[in-house]
Amino acid sequence: MKTNSNTLYIQKLISEGEHIHQDFKFAISDARKIAKSLSAFANTEGGRLLVGVKDNGVAGVRSEEEIYMVEAAATLYCRPEIELETHIYHIEGKDVLEVQINESTQKPIYALDENNHPWAYVRIKDENILANPIHLNIWKHDREEKRVIITYTQREQQILTILKQQGALTLGQCSKLTRMNRKQISRLLADFIRFGLIEQYFEEHTFYFRLKDGE
């Protein structure tokens, strides 16, 4: 791993703050927690993890063990494993680790928890959010390269009509109002998203679904 000295580059990244493509870690003490960040970036648009920084400047990587823990997160606690690109920058007498994560072509990338249960995450603004059944359905269809064919039965029209009337609904509300189970409604909402009829957005710790503008 090559060591670089580029103070301006790191200072610029720190000045950007955390966002959809960047996360700061003051220190690393748990590889499983880092796996969540790796999963979120890989399942969204890719991104960068800066280790040894905080919002107001450089803290420095405490030991080489933190570097090994990032590598362990990618190989031991991500399923499937993901490849990372890492660089160390020597800034202000301290080391900063930059970890580049590419968007995966094998979504979802799962992070294993303490019980080795797999969970997929997505990156929204500056947060790692647990993926919902809609994400999983979309990724499943993308992997299988299925064509989206919408058949407008009474059931499909009912969903669109309800969304038009209500404005925005949660997955649970969609299930209740249509009297479909979560598995059925999740598949239909995923198809509608892939077809460009509706969109999902995240607000106050909840995913909502609404018609796209013009629909």
Task: Annotate each language-model stretch with its function.
Residues 1-215:
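Conserved N-terminal catalytic/coupling substructures associated with nucleotide/phosphate chemistry
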